[in-house]
């Protein structure tokens, strides 16, 4: 194991929760940016799947 010496510097009781919190924050930020920067994602999350799929299909056909 290459990273075994890391636990000599950082205790596992601190390092593992810190890693999990960092992953959760990164995941939240990715989803937040998707909702803020795309029109269809917000529509999909609000429940209007039909309109979201129509917009997605229209943009695919135009490009």
Curated annotation (Swiss-Prot):
Q: Which residues lie on this side of the membrane: Cytoplasmic?
A: 1-14
UniProt GO BP: photosynthesis, light reaction
State the oligomer form and interacting partners: The core complex is formed by different alpha and beta chains, binding bacteriochlorophyll molecules, and arranged most probably in tetrameric structures disposed around the reaction center. The non-pigmented gamma chains may constitute additional components.
Q: Where does a bacteriochlorophyll bind?
A: 31
State its location(s): Cell inner membrane
* Single GO molecular function: electron transporter, transferring electrons within the cyclic electron transport pathway of photosynthesis activity
GO cellular component entries: plasma membrane; plasma membrane light-harvesting complex
Function noted in UniProt? Antenna complexes are light-harvesting systems, which transfer the excitation energy to the reaction centers.
Pfam families documented for this protein: LHC
**Record membrane topology:** Single-pass type II membrane protein
Which named protein is this? Light-harvesting protein B-800/850 alpha chain
Top-level taxon of origin: Bacteria
Recorded family membership: Belongs to the antenna complex alpha subunit family.
Query: Which residue positions does the secretion signal occupy?
Result: none
């Amino acid at each position: 194991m290459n990273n075994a010496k890391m636990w000599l510097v950082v205790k596992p009781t601190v390092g593992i929760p810190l890693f999990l919190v960092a992953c959760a924050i990164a995941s939240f930020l990715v989803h937040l940016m998707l909702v803020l920067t795309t029109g269809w994602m917000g529509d999909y999350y609000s429940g209007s799947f039909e309109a979201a799929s129509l917009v997605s299909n229209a943009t695919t056909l135009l490009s």
